[in-house]
Amino acid sequence: MDDFPLISMFFLATSVLVGMGIGDTLYFRSLKLVGTVRGLLLSNAYPLFTAMIAVLILHEPLTVGLLLGTTFVIAGVILVLTSGRALVKQQGPAIDKGEHLGMVLALLAALCWAITTSMVKVGAQDVDGLSATAVRLVVAAGALLVVGRLSPVGLQLRQYRGRHLAGTVAAGVITALCSVTFLLAIQFTGAAKTATLTSTAPLFGVPMSLLTGEKLTWQTVMGSIVSVAGIWMVVAG
């Protein structure tokens, strides 16, 4: 870590603040204003924003496979997210200002995540994945500690005992592993492809729905097929 470039540390640390501090805050606020489904759908513009930044600023190649694959993945995820759910229509002739604001916040959250992914790509160029991940996790832990201290209810660490403590530790370990794989994916495949592939997270809920006895809808099946086709295009392209 002694030879860790300061510019890399800056981009990696700032990426956490932009993604978690601003992006996640805007996203959770948008969910309160427009609801879960519409918030998820609008924030799903994240891969498109990332591809634009990656191509225009980071000079990553724009291939037909990436373009078509990203479109297919987003369409498939939208089908999965809307399966079995009805978008609640706003009563009255127009959408109120709160919903307009919520839509804007969801899109801004997606833009923040795109900027975060791009900053990670820049910051991780000249360092190894584990060191880069360590920087991001330390900054994230420090930021959460400060937020917890400033919170009216405080950190409340004493309530984490037994199963709660084990679950929290397990979640932390999984988060660390995911952070490593996410950063390595950006290093080896680029920001645009990584953003597209990581946006398929809702698809992993499909097998879980089978285990819990939920009924599969045609949107879920078609969405999964379309997304898998999109993933193949991105990887092959």
Question: Would you name each region that the model predicts?
Answer:
Residues 42-56, 71, 139-143, 178, ...:
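Alpha-helical transmembrane segments of compact multi-pass small-molecule transporters, enriched
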Residues 20-28, 51, 74, 81, ...:
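Residues that mark transmembrane-helix kinks and helix-interface sites
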Residues 98-125, 130, 169:
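Selected transmembrane alpha-helices and immediately adjacent juxtamembrane segments
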Residues 10, 14, 18, 45, ...:
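Hydrophobic residues within alpha-helical transmembrane segments
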Residues 48-111, 210, 215-237:
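Juxtamembrane helix-loop boundary signature in multi-pass membrane transporters
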Residues 25-42, 125-131, 180-197:
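Structural motif at transmembrane-helix junctions in multi-pass transporters
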Residues 1-14, 24-34, 75, 82-104, ...:
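Membrane-interface interhelical linkers
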